[in-house]
Amino acid sequence: MAAELSEKYFQMQDLCRAAMEYAREIVKPGMNLRKFRAMCEQYLLDNGADSFWWDNIGAFIFSGDETAVSVLPDRYEASDKCIEDNDIITIDLSPQRNGVWGDYARTIILQDGKVVENISDIRQEEWKNGLLMEELLHNTLVDIVNEDMTFEELHERINTLT
């Protein structure tokens, strides 16, 4: 039973990864964030999600200065603004199928209207440094976490790194 449930979670995460790749393929300057959100949510529904677990929002999408804002789902509405040639976009996906959640967030950088593939190629230093720090934290987490570790142990271990 546990293996079957784990497989369902892996499938939802695979859906999220595919949806994020789709988002990277379709994002372009001039695209309205509301339209972008709708396209991402439709992709999730067309490819296996039956609903969205976080207040029925399947894709939280922010760009520019909005990426530094934290918004509760009951107050979220995608901005009626367009993506710029040089922009930072955050996407947080929350699909579900039969009560099994997917949860996946990424940042996309556009430079001269094109998605930047490598962090080292980002010209905007603040964005580059933020993504480098995120990468460092992720790699550190992967290096120190194991199946038997409690959240308390993880918290203690992370605090020793600062």
Positions of predicted regions on the chain:
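Active-site neighborhoods and metal-handling regions in enzymes and metal-associated proteins
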Residues: M1-T162
